[in-house]
């Protein structure tokens, strides 16, 4: 199953769990929410942007970057098998690899993200 799922779009959780219950593999697209949290406040997606400002605020994720927090949040979901993370910047790729190498977020950070909704 290929589905959009990320720190800002968590609604597919039940779909992912149902797919795993029948042994389907899970591929995540848009794991970084199209980096909506790094862009200026858009007119059309203001609600999503505002959610990003809450869930990925420095007081929630500490000194992690928003990209690192987003990738490591996704790693905490054991139902996910892989994610498609596109980039044209080799440094961004290396940063993503380094972030994933640090493993899932600590439980307190994951809980703080959930509470910031």
Sequence positions of predicted segments:
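Beta/alpha (TIM)-barrel catalytic core signal, keyed to glycine-rich beta->alpha loops juxtaposed to Asp/Glu
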Residues: 1-117
